[in-house]
Amino acid sequence: MAVSPDGKEIAMVIRGDVFVTSTEYKTTRRITNTPEQERGVSFSKDGRELYYAAERGGCWGVWRTVLTEKNDKLFTYATRTREELFSEPGRTSFQPIVSPDGKWVAYLRDRTELVVRATKGGDVKSLLRGANYSYQDGDQSFAWSPDSEYLLTEYQADGGWNNTDIALIEVSSGKVTDLTESGYSDGSFRWALG
């Protein structure tokens, strides 16, 4: 579930499809209507794009639905929308999270790699390669810093698969800083004062 930046809409996945509902009125709109499933919704900063993971043709990808008409302000009352693939075709990708400044989308690629891509398009930037593996939905977590310059995530450093640490990743350089190095599994991180 995701709340739009202006607080006027809530996006959610119900029975595998994306819906958006108004917080002010009793209006709900179905965004997707496919035999495959969707999950993990995230609004853009301006609320005009909705990102989500969707299974299409047997492959998970990050998709977005865009408000195409200038006069449309909300998904619940939009006259037209357009769905498009955001991640690379043929690469398993899911769990999109839009940065607070609206410039980036972070997501998991191939179940092992944390990547970012600019919302305007362009190349995908790998931030954390292949050490982690996502066995089930939501078992890999990451969060944007309030200034959109860093990501916090759990990762496997020197301790192997049974010892996760908390990493601070600088998006611009890709520098990974292990914040915990405790010798024990660490998790449940949060940004403070954001």
Please report, for each region that a protein language model flagged, where it lies by residue.
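A flexible loop/linker signature enriched in serine peptidases of the S9 family
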Residues: K8-F19, T23-E24, R30-R39, R48-F75, ...
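Residue-level detector of Asp-centered blade-edge/turn motifs that repeat once per structural unit
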Residues: P5-D6, K45-D46, P100-D101, P146-D147, ...
